[in-house]
Regions:
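Conserved interdomain linker/interface between the two RecA-like ATPase lobes of SF2 helicase motors
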Residues: 160-223
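Post-DEXD/H (motif II) to motif III coupling segment of the RecA-like Helicase ATP-binding lobe
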Residues: 114, 121-180
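Conserved Walker A/P-loop ATP-binding site and its immediately adjacent core
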Residues: 31-33, 42-68
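Conserved Walker B
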Residues: 112, 119-121, 203
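N-terminal pre-P-loop "Q-motif" helix
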Residues: 1-16
């Protein structure tokens, strides 16, 4: 509630095109929080909302959570018809799909007051900011460090609000205390990027492949 109150203070006190970044650890409930923000915003502001994600799985998951909060929303994918867009106050989309729809002038965003960017540290979202020059941008992420060292997040956001830490979330029973186990796995396919960390692409390719997921399941069953 404290985070939501802070964010709504910015809605009231800051310019309508303000860019705010909100950080909360993984598992802290970012989707729940911004779904409640959308619900309250639509009631208060009477403007439309766009929620951006970077993966189709997150797109569908976000749409479901928004629906659970009573927010009538539409997923904008490559197959979706937008003839009924006037019936919706909230749209959920991935970057490339929305970019193509906007370039083709298929989606009316003239009444969009708020854009929420999930996993905002991914730089692919920046290409869409030009379409929402008059909208309030709310980025949410667990890691407020840009995926590209040459494109720092300070270039796109005016302020950072830091949420509760992992230890605070555990203490307040929002997160469970983790039991940690380690296994030796091959990491030779990981590529080090310009910022000294492994690239997002090589990490996703390694940790989401079937062999790695099978090892994860086996490790869980052994414990």
């Amino acid at each position: 509630k404290g985070a939501i109150d802070k964010i709504f203070e910015r809605f009231e006190d800051c310019p309508s095109d303000y860019h705010l970044l909100y950080q909360l650890p993984t598992g802290g409930g970012k989707t729940i929080i911004f779904s409640e923000i959308v619900r309250q915003y639509l009631k208060l502001k009477k403007k439309k909302v766009v929620v951006l994600t970077h993966r189709i799985e997150l797109c569908n998951q976000t749409s479901k959570v928004l629906s659970d909060f009573g927010v009538l929303n539409k997923v904008v994918n490559s197959k979706a018809s937008l003839d009924d867009q006037e019936q919706y106050s909230c749209f959920v989309a991935m970057v490339e799909t929305l970019n193509n729809r906007l370039l083709d002038d298929k989606l009316d965003i003239s009444d969009v007051g708020l854009v929420i960017i999930d996993e905002a540290h991914y730089n692919s979202f920046t290409k869409l900011l030009k379409f929402f020059s008059s909208s309030f941008i709310l980025g949410v992420t667990a890691t407020p460090l840009s995926s590209n060292i040459n494109l720092p997040m300070t270039d796109n956001y005016d302020e950072l609000i830091v949420g509760e830490s992992i230890s605070e979330l555990i203490k307040n029973n929002f997160l469970a205390r983790a039991n940690l186990y380690t296994y030796n796995v091959g990491l030779t396919s990981l590529i080090v990027g310009a910022n000294g960390d492994y690239t997002v692409k090589s990490s996703e390719e390694l940790y989401t492949n079937n062999d790695m997921l099978s090892k994860l399941l086996l490790a869980y069953e052994e414990r």
